[in-house]
């Protein structure tokens, strides 16, 4: 079977389109009415089941491994910022390519902990997930953290962050810019106890103030940056650098996939992390994955002399000057 994740906060027309596109044989739900329960039951009542309905069931047949590494495994919808959301087709190979990178990430966390917190002998790490399960960032954690014997702490709402992190000690978490700023204020104002031992906030490299990140690193936090997208199954680049010069970087490319910066500055990725394509949309797939297998991310990047990559903007936002020069408004804004 193929797993399809859905965002319950979308409008019914959006969900109706996505469900209709994938034509499911079974829909599992938690029984909560998110504003479209009546429409869901009217349209899909015969295949609608409670989330826990499987616990009393018996398999209809013996389960054998009949799937290939490159067969479709999961469908995840993109945000749809450029129109209707697209269903990204991900395979087993995609997930295990990314899982390999995440295992390296966990080992880097342990190395940091042994060096900077030698008094803490507990090597069972915990990850606080505030992103929903339909988000690839949390979904991939379900593969990696339990396999390592580590804890995954799930929170359902950003507004409950301080309550939940107090109840569930966590070493690491992926953070949005607003939350990183809140963590920074807690540390600078002597309120670090509110974070209950959190020491590895992980961000998306294009969004944060480098000086703020460097200051958090000086205060004893391990700052990591991750670049990835649904179309690469979350794989991309991870930055472990803690110095102010490189801390805002997306990091150095690893050996899990290939990376290049095209002549127009667009970051391209090729390898086992790249999606199978967009479901039922070969034209859209051809627009982003070329004949040589390179995924064109739509993000602009540059690399410094030491091999660190920096995300500088979006290709679609480029301003073309009269001289023919391409200028990224995001990069221009930072200079101003």
Describe the function of each predicted region.
Residues 96-126, 133-197:
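Conserved AMP-binding/adenylation subdomain of ANL enzymes
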């Amino acid at each position: 079977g193929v797993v399809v994740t859905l965002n319950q906060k979308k409008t019914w027309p959006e969900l109706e389109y996505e469900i209709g596109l994938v034509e499911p044989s079974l829909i599992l739900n938690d029984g909560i009415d998110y504003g479209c329960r009546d429409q869901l039951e009217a349209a899909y009542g015969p295949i609608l089941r409670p989330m826990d309905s499987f616990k009393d069931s018996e398999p209809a047949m013996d389960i054998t491994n009949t799937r290939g590494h490159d067969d479709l495994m999961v469908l995840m919808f993109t945000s749809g910022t450029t129109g209707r959301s697209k269903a990204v087709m991900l395979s087993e190979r995609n997930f295990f390519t990314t899982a390999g990178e995440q295992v390296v990430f966990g080992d880097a966390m342990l190395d940091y902990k042994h060096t900077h917190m030698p008094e803490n002998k507990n090597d069972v790490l915990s990850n606080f997930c505030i992103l929903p399960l339909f988000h690839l960032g949390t979904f991939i954690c379900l593969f990696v953290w339990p396999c390592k014997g580590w804890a995954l702490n799930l929170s359902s709402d950003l507004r409950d962050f301080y309550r939940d992190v107090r109840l569930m000690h966590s070493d690491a978490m992926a953070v949005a810019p607003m939350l990183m700023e809140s963590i920074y204020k807690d540390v600078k104002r002597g309120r670090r106890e509110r974070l209950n031992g959190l020491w590895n906030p992980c961000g998306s490299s294009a969004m944060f103030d480098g000086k703020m990140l460097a200051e958090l690193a000086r205060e004893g936090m391990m700052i990591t940056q991750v670049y990835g997208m649904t179309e690469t199954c979350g794989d991309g680049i991870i930055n472990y650098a803690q110095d102010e010069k490189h801390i805002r970087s997306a990091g150095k490319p690893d050996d899990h996939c290939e990376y290049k910066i095209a002549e127009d500055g667009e970051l391209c990725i090729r390898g086992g992390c790249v999606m199978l394509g967009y479901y039922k949309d070969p034209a859209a797939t051809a627009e982003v994955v070329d004949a040589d297998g390179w995924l064109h991310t739509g993000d602009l990047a540059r690399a410094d002399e030491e091999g660190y990559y920096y995300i500088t903007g979006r290709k679609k936002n480029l301003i073309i000057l009269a001289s023919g020069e391409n200028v990224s408004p995001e990069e221009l804004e930072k200079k101003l």
